[in-house]
């Protein structure tokens, strides 16, 4: 009987201890409380672009970041010499097979990788914008962070549209959630192309018209020339899509002109051929 009482007492003590253990507040959760913390959180992401671990694409001066995400996008662009690119040393000689599979739309992993990474990034930008609204900051302080996040979010949405939305079918846009508080509760059905482009163009237009000057020591994509260039691409691509409008090409030309006005073209005297 004495042994039974001892065992019961040990069990009670153990359960009591477990209850206390489970009630301990976690110490590995870092809440965002200040503007500087929000700014630093986005700044960590921007560092990838500002100080990338990159080489240059063979035969070009285009920065190359060693990631399948960027590799896939290069395959569908027109700013590289494909013959030179697929023969260079990246991915230890397997890049030619990767290119052929991607060009023929037979790459089995590519869609999932792009979908996951781009939507994860969009969720991150949503969080930045949401947290920014909860901290104290001046208009200028808020603008440089919010515009940076909105330009990046719009660019990611545009790339997803190019890859996953059937070009001429307006009803097949993308699922879009801009509310960081509704991660599992939002409407995940496809919006129309018109609805998605409206979001993209609205965010980019808001940023290009923002009166707060970008900070050269912080901002990367919140750059009026970059925003004009992205808007030119968006309107040009949209111009023959299921969401096309009569003024798309006119808008594309206008934004392209604005993007080029601040650029100095290379003269023949300064030209250096690629090695």
Locations of the language-model features?
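Short coil/linker segments at helix-helix boundaries
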Residues: 163-199, 241-250
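Well-ordered alpha-helical segments within folded domains of soluble proteins
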Residues: 121-129, 176, 226-233
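Short, surface-exposed recognition loops and adjoining beta-strand edges that mediate ligand/DNA contacts
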Residues: 28-33, 67-70, 213-275
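Inward-facing hydrophobic residues that define packing positions of alpha-helical scaffold repeats
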Residues: 122-125, 197, 204, 249, ...
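Bacterial Sec-dependent N-terminal signal peptides
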Residues: 1-26
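Conserved, well-structured interaction surfaces
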Residues: 88-164, 191-194, 205-215
């Amino acid at each position: 009987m004495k042994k039974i009482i001892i065992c019961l007492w040990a069990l009670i003590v153990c359960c009591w201890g477990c209850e206390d253990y489970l009630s301990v507040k976690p110490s590995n959760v870092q809440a965002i409380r200040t503007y500087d913390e929000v700014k630093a959180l986005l700044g960590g992401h921007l560092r990838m672009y500002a100080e990338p671990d990159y080489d240059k694409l063979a035969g070009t001066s285009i920065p190359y970041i060693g990631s399948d995400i960027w590799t896939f996008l290069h395959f569908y662009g027109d700013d590289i010499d494909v013959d030179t690119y697929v023969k260079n040393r990246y991915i230890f000689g397997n890049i030619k097979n990767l290119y052929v599979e991607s060009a023929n739309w037979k790459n089995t992993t590519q869609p999932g990788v792009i979908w996951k990474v781009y939507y994860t990034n969009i969720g991150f930008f949503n969080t930045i914008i949401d947290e920014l609204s909860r901290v104290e900051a001046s208009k200028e302080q808020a603008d440089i962070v919010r515009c940076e996040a909105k330009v990046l979010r719009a660019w990611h949405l545009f790339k997803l549209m190019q890859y996953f939305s059937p070009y001429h079918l307006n009803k097949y846009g993308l699922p879009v959630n801009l509310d960081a508080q509704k991660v599992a509760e939002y409407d995940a059905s496809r919006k129309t192309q018109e609805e998605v482009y409206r979001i993209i163009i609205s965010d980019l237009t808001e940023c290009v018209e923002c009166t707060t000057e970008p900070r050269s020591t912080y901002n990367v994509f919140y750059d009026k020339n970059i925003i004009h260039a992205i808007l030119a691409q968006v309107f040009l691509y949209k111009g023959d899509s299921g969401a096309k409008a009569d003024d798309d090409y006119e808008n594309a030309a206008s934004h392209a002109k604005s993007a080029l006005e601040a650029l100095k073209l290379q003269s023949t005297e300064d030209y250096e051929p690629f090695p």
